[in-house]
Regions:
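C-terminal subdomain of alpha/beta-hydrolase-fold enzymes, centered on the catalytic histidine
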Residues: 244-398
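The serine-hydrolase catalytic nucleophile loop
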Residues: 105-117
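Non-catalytic accessory segments flanking enzyme active sites
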Residues: 15-90, 95, 294, 303-306, ...
Length: 398
């Protein structure tokens, strides 16, 4: 007899009918006219999406992604009434440090797959055995193969509590956490909750910058450039955020009915990653691991799981949580564990060290790297893994 704490093996087996339906829908797309500008200022460009659709129906193989996922140990377990899907790869090095790593939107566990080898088996990737991790990659509630919450309240704080339960259930009394995008918000919440066993966090996005932008330093050229990037995002890159934080259900109808509509919505996230992805499709010149196959893998996962609307609801929850916090006038509790932060140059706003120290006075590790963007682990998995190793190295037990 099963119980609520069971950890159950998971294997993906997509019905042929689902793939045939996807293909029919893509081929039946009703296309808009071309944008009237030569950049993305009106949105995702027609040439990019049409080339993506052509590849999706003529050159892409979902079964290859399915096999890649099924080659990894996957599981589900029920936490707080929601079935959570996760990948759990234990290193061959028994003294490895347990690490829970959280993806964001419009990402999934797909964006983290390239870092699995470097993090769990560093000796095969130019690293040392003492830098190994036991890796846990959960799918956020309402994302991918995790179930949709059926009640309100699944904001970053609640997800952080669920992740602490997951690590306890897996038998890890001491672990670290990492995240970017939505995952950065969840990991930040874990650091502020400081559950027993969590000894450090590492982030690639300074998610808290939006709420305190007027308090962030603007003295140096780098700081002023970061302010400029943040202002540009708030004025010209905020469309998806505003829609999903106010009307996720409304956009959800389109996201679950049109694969091409879903693809365009997911591509229209940030300028740096959009142009890199566009280059992969239009010019056939991918940047890092942002290849045509990996991009379509991620979009197809959203489509097959029907999670366009449910994933968007995290933003609605976040908006209400932040509004309530602002109305209360109470500052969030401090992060009481060591914090590591890596600034990737293509991030929506590449936070200077002074900004990271403002948000995290206990900053223990900071580095600026020369390449990579918002999807750091996806685009540059080896570099990303190097940063994660460096950030957590002082926290390992000898």
């Amino acid at each position: 007899m099963s119980n609520g704490n069971d950890v159950r093996p998971f294997r993906l087996d997509t019905p042929d009918e689902a793939l045939a339906d996807l293909r029919r829908r893509v081929e039946a797309t009703r296309w808009p006219s071309r944008e009237l500008v030569d950049d993305r200022s009106q949105g995702v460009q027609l040439a990019t999406v049409q080339e993506l659709a052509r590849y999706w129906t003529s050159g892409y193989d979902w079964r290859a992604c399915e096999a890649k996922l099924n080659a990894l140990p996957q599981f589900t377990t029920s936490i707080d009434g929601v079935d959570i899907h996760f990948i759990h790869v234990r290193s061959k090095h028994e003294d490895a440090l347990p690490l829970i790593m959280t993806h964001g939107w419009p990402g999934s566990v797909v964006e983290l797959l390239g870092s699995v080898g470097p993090l769990t088996d560093p000796t095969a990737h130019g690293g040392a055995a003492e830098d190994a991790f036991h890796l846990v990659l959960p799918s956020l509630p309402g994302y991918g193969f995790s179930a949709e919450p059926t009640e309100l309240g699944w904001n970053s704080n609640r997800i952080a509590q669920a992740w602490a339960q997951l690590m306890d259930r897996l038998g890890y009394p001491r672990y670290v956490a990492q995240g970017g995008d939505v995952g950065a918000s969840v990991t930040d919440a874990m650091g502020r909750q400081a559950p027993e066993g969590l000894v450090g966090i590492h982030l690639t996005l300074l998610a808290g910058a939006i709420g305190i932008k007027d308090k962030l330093p603007a003295n140096t050229e780098q700081e002023r450039a970061a302010h400029g990037a943040l202002e540009t995002f708030m004025k010209d890159g905020f469309g998806y955020f505003l829609e999903q934080s106010t009307r996720p259900q409304t956009i959800g109808y389109s996201l679950l009915d049109s694969p091409v509509g879903l693809a365009a919505w997911m591509l229209d996230h940030d300028t740096d990653s959009y142009y890199k992805i566009s280059r992969a499709f239009v010019d056939g010149e991918p940047v890092g691991r942002l290849t045509r196959d990996s991009v379509v893998d991620n979009i197809t996962l959203y489509w097959l799981t029907g999670t366009g609307a449910s994933s968007a609801r995290w933003y609605w929850e976040a908006g209400r949580f932040l509004a309530a916090a602002a109305a209360s006038g109470q500052a969030p509790p401090p992060v009481s564990v060591p914090v590591g932060f890596t600034a990737f140059p293509g991030e929506i706003w590449a936070a200077p060290r002074s900004w990271a120290e403002t948000v995290y006075p206990g900053l223990a590790y900071f580095n600026e790297v020369e390449k990579g963007g918002h999807f750091a682990a996806w685009e540059e998995p080896e570099l990303f893994a190097t940063e994660v190793r460096a950030a957590f190295r002082p926290l390992r037990q000898s």
